[in-house]
């Protein structure tokens, strides 16, 4: 069984560095990371946002959204959440 809670907690603690890696054209605006969505031809940052306190994310231009860092990792990688959780756990040195 994958411990999504543990992986998400570790990811939230590391979110600033994860977001800088995953969305390098983004920037912090208050408690959010604002970037272009790399999954579509997004020309201007603004509609794709990640709450750095909770890990919730949304692309307000497409209504795609998720509630935690694992779902963001899955979305960005185009994989399922289980695969993304395992990869994220490995990256963070957390037992899945």
Language-model regions, residue ranges each:
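N-terminal structured subdomain of primase-like DNA metabolism proteins
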Residues: 1-96
């Amino acid at each position: 069984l994958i411990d999504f809670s543990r992986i998400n907690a570790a990811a939230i603690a590391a979110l600033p560095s994860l977001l800088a890696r995953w969305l390098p054209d983004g920037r912090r605006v208050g408690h959010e990371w604002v970037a272009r969505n790399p999954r579509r031809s997004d020309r201007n940052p603004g509609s794709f946002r990640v709450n750095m306190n909770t890990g919730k994310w949304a692309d307000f231009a497409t209504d795609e959204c998720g509630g935690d860092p694992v779902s963001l990792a899955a979305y960005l990688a185009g994989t399922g959440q289980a695969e993304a959780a395992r990869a994220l756990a490995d990256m963070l040195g957390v037992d899945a």
